[in-house]
Amino acid sequence: MPETMRLSNLRDLRSGDRVNLERTLRLMDGLDGHIVSGHVEGIGVIAKCRQDGIANVVTVKTPPELMRYILHKGSIAIDGISLTVTDVTEDT
């Protein structure tokens, strides 16, 4: 658990804070999209959000040591939501 506390925002939570809990996916449940699996490797900061037609573009400032894992057309997850990477800069 020390690694979870170090790599997530759980250390910032206090008693009474609201958190997102989701029901377990059952095998017979339908999916709208795809399953996100993986491990938390770090915390990014949402630097900017803007609308581009029907799309929402989210700019995430990412720790430098994680940037080598962020690939154009790859994916990241924010709060369990899978997002496609459309542009990669030095730190976003």
Residue spans for each PLM region:
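Conserved loop->alpha-helix
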Residues: M1-T92
